[in-house]
Swiss-Prot record:
Main location: mitochondrion
PROSITE patterns according to UniProt: CYTB_CTER (PS51003), CYTB_NTER (PS51002)
Residue ranges crossing the lipid bilayer per the database entry: 34-54, 78-99, 114-134, 179-199, 227-247, 289-309, 321-341, 348-368
Originating gene: MT-CYB
Organism: Seleucidis melanoleucus
Extra facts: Heme 1 (or BL or b562) is low-potential and absorbs at about 562 nm, and heme 2 (or BH or b566) is high-potential and absorbs at about 566 nm.
Designated name of the protein: Cytochrome b
GO cellular component, one term: respiratory chain complex III
Gene Ontology MF: a single term: ubiquinol-cytochrome-c reductase activity
Co-factor note (free text): Binds 2 heme b groups non-covalently.
Length: 380
């Protein structure tokens, strides 16, 4: 009998075991599409980013003009730039939904997969931050100044650390050059870690909406889920194209159409929408070091989630109290996002402080207590 190349070739075998003959639970829903959508986002961002990098100049006197030149004079440069800028937003939408799905259905109990996923989120946030600095507009410059300055809150070594990161005494040419280098490098680190993420996932297999073992009822990934993923790709790429073609500047800040000027501070310095929840938590604490610690904790808290799981059930599918708490948490994050975009004045300060307090209380205190209560109610 002739050898089946797909199943025996050293390289094709890896692809086959990951994308074709992979045993997959028969009941996973649309919420399991986001992993592959994130892969498509990454590929799109790397391709568009590479094309942009061929025309970009990482120098403070030329960066802004090189981006303008790209949009005006390069064939389809405007489209590539708009796809790249809005692709970042879609990337974050997908990753937040992906994390939310993992949280709801108890996927975090695959600890290695979850922890690498959190590291991927942190690197993605770093990549998006350094990328936002590259066009060298007003918000790029001041965003870089404000966020890098936060490291000065670290006791004893803070100021030295900031000046080392800047390559001088303020955000300037050396900063831009190194941020470009990092922005070019990090997506490939993300791609490498994604493979590790998948390797750990395929050790245990996917979770499913019921949160129970599904070894007795697995189906091949192709054609059942490959066709489902293609539908997801189409919907996402259509959304991206619509955003990039009809309202490319919807999610951007108009301040970034002004070249960076160290002598003029914009009235409201704020990051892109996908960082606003963390920015609101940072601002809600009046102390600099406290704010920085809260900012770090707002994302690093994800590492603790597997340790805070007190329920006897994996998924929230049959846990109505936890479901209510989960949707309160989602609403709370939306409130934080909105508050982060508002100026620092009366109603927003207290709303932000309450929402920040609620965020940590729900995750660290209420979820474990409610899970124990549900165990009692269900006599588990």
């Amino acid at each position: 009998m002739a050898l089946n190349l797909r199943k025996n070739h050293p390289l094709l075998k890896i692809i086959n075991d990951s994308l074709i003959d992979l045993p997959t639970p028969s009941n996973i829903s649309i919420w399991w599409n986001f992993g592959s959508l994130l892969g498509i986002c990454l590929i799109t961002q790397i391709i568009t980013g590479l094309l942009l990098a061929t025309h970009y100049t990482a120098d403070t006197s030329l960066a802004f003009n090189s981006v303008a030149h790209m949009c005006r004079n390069v064939q389809f440069g405007w489209l590539i730039r708009n796809l790249h800028a809005n692709g970042a937003s879609l990337f974050f939408i997908c990753i937040y939904l992906h994390i939310g799905r993992g949280f709801y259905y108890g996927s975090y109990l695959n600890k290695e997969t979850w922890n690498i996923g959190v590291i991927l989120l942190l690197i993605l946030m770093a990549t998006a931050f350094v990328g936002y600095v590259l066009p060298w507009g007003q918000m790029s410059f001041w965003g870089a100044t404000v966020i890098t300055n936060l490291f000065s809150a670290i006791p004893y070594i803070g100021q030295t650390l900031v000046e080392w990161a800047w390559g001088g005494f303020s955000v300037d040419n050396p900063t831009l050059t190194r941020f470009f280098a990092l922005h070019f490098l990090l997506p490939f680190v993300i791609a490498g870690l994604t493979l590790v993420h998948l390797t750990f996932l395929h050790e245990t297999g996917s979770n499913n909406p019921l949160g129970i073992p599904s070894d007795c009822d697995k189906i091949p990934f192709h054609p059942y889920y490959s066709i489902k993923d293609i539908l997801g790709f189409a919907l996402m790429l259509i959304s991206l194209a619509a955003l990039a073609l009809f309202s490319p500047n919807l999610l951007g800040d108009p301040e970034n159409f002004t070249p960076a000027n160290p002598l003029a501070t914009p009235p409201h310095i704020k990051p892109e929408w996908y960082f606003l929840f963390a920015y609101a938590i940072l601002r809600s604490i009046p102390n600099k070091l406290g704010g920085v610690l809260a900012l770090a904790a707002s994302v690093l808290i994800l590492f603790l989630i597997p340790l805070l799981h007190t329920s006897k059930q994996r998924s929230m599918t049959f846990r109505p109290l936890s479901q209510i708490l989960f949707w309160i948490l989602v609403t709370n994050l939306l409130i934080l996002t909105w508050v982060g975009s508002q100026p620092v004045e009366h109603p927003f300060i207290i709303i932000g402080q309450l929402a920040s307090f609620s965020y940590f209380t729900i995750i660290l205190v209420l979820f474990p207590i409610v899970s124990v209560l549900e165990n009692k109610l269900l006599n588990l």
